[in-house]
Design a protein with these regions (language model features):
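Membrane-helix interface segments
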Residues: 70-71, 189-190, 224-225
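Hydrophobic faces of transmembrane alpha-helices in multi-pass small-molecule transporters and flippases
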Residues: 9-13, 28-59, 63, 84-88, ...
Length: 258
């Protein structure tokens, strides 16, 4: 809470001093039904989308927890490391959201196309760096978060296996976030919501059925765990197909409905 409040305070002071036109005056505090409608139109589908995605994550976490305490410890190790790896991709998508929104409002559609192209190039550049870091450190990540004497072979296996499967697929997350930003910036929030449903279905189906299909005699085997690890990349792939395909159609085929 303190960190978030400090961040808000510093940011507010900065833009208040740097950008006078962003200073809120009493005359600005009034309701505009068109703006309210747009906020609900964009915000509600995205809110529901994140709720749906968290449901899928809960299902995956429940299945991983069934593998025992070592698997649970591995989750606490690889999740923050995964977050570190994806920071560049997340930052680019956030910047792209603002860029698309501004240029869509100004009807500078060619700049949006250029921004998409440049972001993909930057995603690929960061991806290769992430790939090297993720694969080379996969088996060493537990030592970062837990004492060396507690990092047994099972924890290292669960953590390294997940990262070795996930890291090569992080380019999908970059494309997913880029597509989501483009769709949000062009006020098409319903498509990310639908992709979230597809992602949820894909993740749940893999978590529920793949372990038993791989090893029906022992659905908690190492091979079954590997199958569960693929649930995240498959969910990303489903979202990329839905949202990426929509971006191609809207931006390049329909030219923003022009």
């Amino acid at each position: 809470i303190i960190a978030n409040f400090s961040n808000f305070l510093i940011t507010a002071i900065y833009f208040y001093k740097k950008y006078p036109y962003l200073r809120i005056q009493p005359s600005n505090i009034k309701l505009d039904k068109n703006i309210i409608f747009d906020l609900f139109k964009i915000g509600l589908p995205l809110g529901f989308q994140w709720s749906i995605l968290f449901i899928g994550s809960f299902v995956q976490a429940e299945k991983v927890n069934a593998f025992g305490r070592s698997a649970q410890t591995a989750v606490s190790c690889y999740q923050p490391f995964e977050g570190y790896l994806t920071i560049p991709l997340s930052v680019l998508s956030t910047a792209m959201l603002s860029f698309v929104g501004q240029n869509y409002g100004a009807q500078n559609y060619n700049r949006i196309k250029d921004g998409i192209k440049d972001t993909i190039i930057l995603d690929l550049c960061f991806y290769f760096i992430i790939l090297i870091l993720g694969l080379s450190l996969a088996s060493k990540v537990p030592y970062i978060f837990i004492p060396r004497e507690d990092a047994n072979d099972e924890i290292i296996f669960y953590c390294a296996t997940y990262l070795r499967i996930l890291t090569p697929c992080l380019i999908l997350q970059g494309l997913l976030q880029l597509s989501r930003s483009v769709l949000q910036g062009t006020k098409r929030a319903i498509i990310p919501f639908l992709s979230g449903i597809g992602e949820l279905v894909g993740r749940i189906l893999i978590c529920l059925f793949i372990p038993s299909l791989i090893n029906s005699a022992n659905p908690l085997s190492n091979e079954s765990y590997i199958g569960i690890c693929f649930s995240t990349p498959v969910a990303w792939l489903i979202s990329v197909i839905i949202m990426g395909g929509s971006v191609i159609y809207i931006v390049y085929k329909k030219n923003f409905n022009q």
